[in-house]
């Protein structure tokens, strides 16, 4: 019984460690890279689809940051008008 409980505890610890390695998505905890598109991801994260374009994770994050910044600037300009 003790070994079963230790095994379950080890599985929980490993699952949480894998989730912390890729904090963008809590759904795909058993995969190191999420392969879903943002629209199909249950949590709506942009952790995905960069493998299809050949981008690295850093390039994808930088592209997303630029997109969010330009979207925010356009929104602020529309509020000023």
Swiss-Prot record:
Contains 3 disulfide bonds. Coiled coil: none annotated. It is found in: Secreted. One of its GO terms (molecular function) is toxin activity. Keywords: Disulfide bond, Secreted, Signal, Toxin. Expressed by the venom gland. Residues 1-17 form the signal peptide. GO terms for cellular component: extracellular region. Belongs to the scutigerotoxin-02 family. This is U-scutigerotoxin(02)-Tl2a.
């Amino acid at each position: 019984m003790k070994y079963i409980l230790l095994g379950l505890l080890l599985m929980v610890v490993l699952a949480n460690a894998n989730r912390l390695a890729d904090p963008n998505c809590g759904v795909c905890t058993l995969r190191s890279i999420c392969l879903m598109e943002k629209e199909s991801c249950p949590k709506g994260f942009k952790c995905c689809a960069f493998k299809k374009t050949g981008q690295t994770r850093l390039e994808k994050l930088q592209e997303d940051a630029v997109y969010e910044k330009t979207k925010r600037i356009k929104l602020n300009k529309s509020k000023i008008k």
